[in-house]
Amino acid sequence: MKLITILFLCSRLLPSLTQESSQEIDCNDQDVFKAVDAALTKYNSENKSGNQFVLYRITEVARMDNPDTFYSLKYQIKEGDCPFQSNKTWQDCDYKDSAQAATGQCTATVAKRGNMKFSVAIQTCLITPAEGPVVTAQYECLGCVHPISTKSPDLEPVLRYAIQYFNNNTSHSHLFDLKEVKRAQKQVVSGWNYEVNYSIAQTNCSKEEFSFLTPDCKSLSSGDTGECTDKAHVDVKLRISSFSQKCDLYPGEDFLPPMVCVGCPKPIPVDSPDLEEALNHSIAKLNAEHDGTFYFKIDTVKKATVQVVGGLKYSIVFIARETTCSKGSNEELTKSCEINIHGQILHCDANVYVVPWEEKVYPTVNCQPLGQTSLMKRPPGFSPFRSVQVMKTEGSTTVSLPHSAMSPVQDEERDSGKEQGPTHGHGWDHGKQIKLHGLGLGHKHKHDQGHGHHRSHGLGHGHQKQHGLGHGHKHGHGHGKHKNKGKNNGKHYDWRTPYLASSYEDSTTSSAQTQEKTEETTLSSLAQPGVAITFPDFQDSDLIATVMPNTLPPHTESDDDWIPDIQTEPNSLAFKLISDFPETTSPKCPSRPWKPVNGVNPTVEMKESHDFDLVDALL
């Protein structure tokens, strides 16, 4: 148990330990604003005419620790009302009128030196004037070291030179190739200084056979690896004038050159033209040996190998299917023979030995029939994921629904002997069909008075087992429990106990005594006695109409007695599970606008709203 706990905690900590050095942070961070302030101040100081630009908002930011802290920024600016010659800073300026103001977007890399000093390494701004084409302004700090992308095209000549330098100045038996560039920095001097950190991997090309890397040289997964840190200076003529390299090699697994196996089977593509002759001989052999009346045809080739053994030996696995061409009317199998979708299917293993110089072919084929699956017929519209229980009763077949949380097991009724009491009940129904549990149907009289045999509660007459849904004799004497919220001359019981013991036990039953014509009711779709419901005539509507009661019974406390009470603490694991996905957080970028534009609140975006019109909803 302790080991499982440790592994679980480690799996949660590993993602945090393997995070990259570059990470996104909040655009409203104080240090981010200071970095943007340094970048925008630097841009304004480079311009000698026109107005200063004012920050609108920061759109993207990422921090890199390598080992100094660098901020990669993207922010939007708007032209202000302060001239460049004024002694004001951009923070003291307001936005110029939008119709006449220029806008722009800048991308910058800013280094943080110490705790408070920010210096701009590189910056590019795209300015869109109120009238005229877009103007691009670039700035690169002379002498400032700043990180660059590991996929920068400027690194390609440096890396190419570095790999060649390593292969020429090491005593390793094989050539190495670039594996991954991990980190790169650039500095503008009288030329450019580069510092690159990358990994290398051993290839399959030995120095005895190859003097330099070629496209045939591939990195070995089990070969030696290394990690290098290089420093290079590229002059203004784009030549590498100085270079230094430091590499650490790590031995891999024992490298063994692949052995060439003469005579071993080699896999070949299943659609290779070399298989055509072998397949033709295989299917001809199959049709000659099979005693069926129809020809077989190759449907699918699963796999194939070829082996050089005094010739060529083909081993083929394929699926053959019976065609519509009979052997009696066709001398041989032709391409026009179509596959019989209801015919026999064979799984075949063929070995074809071809001796080209003798022009002889020796095929052998072994086939096994594949089993055929027959589908069972279901009632129309009936899903295989639904189950219906069919119960035999006297003279009829009843379809019952699966039990739900509101229906007890049917055996409760049969096992309950308390419902055999000698209590007589009288029911009164003044020409109305009241939708209560246990309303029975019988001979309709003016006042509908009578007695009946009951095993459920309610006003019903006849032999009934549930809700009084059935036809029977209106006049009769029987024993059973009665419940009537109106007039009841029988004994009064608590309504909870008989309801739970008898409600929802059987789906529907039909009396086997009398079939008399009754008034038209909503229950005319009930199953008639002596008529069995067969599956071809069975419909979903029949199932629903037969078993759904008119009204649902009231919910009781005892209905949920089968659900156990689980005691949990509010702060327990049952309430606070560890999610497999990161929690969603509010977006960190873009930042809030620096100040309002034309009187608009910078923290609230105003949207035009219209009153709701009913016509819009109807369109």
Curated annotation (Swiss-Prot):
Please list which residues make up the signal peptide. Answer: 1-18
**Organism field:** Bos taurus (Bovine)
Give a brief account of the tissues where this protein occurs. Answer: Plasma.
The Gene Ontology terms for molecular function here are: cysteine-type endopeptidase inhibitor activity
Q: Which residues carry this modification: Pyrrolidone carboxylic acid?
A: 19
Listed GO cellular component terms? extracellular region
Q: Which domain of life is it from?
A: Eukaryota
- Any idea what this protein is called? Kininogen-2
> Which Pfam families did the record assign?
Cystatin
Which cysteines share a disulfide bond? 27-589, 82-93, 106-125, 141-144, 205-217, 228-247, 261-264, 325-337, 348-367
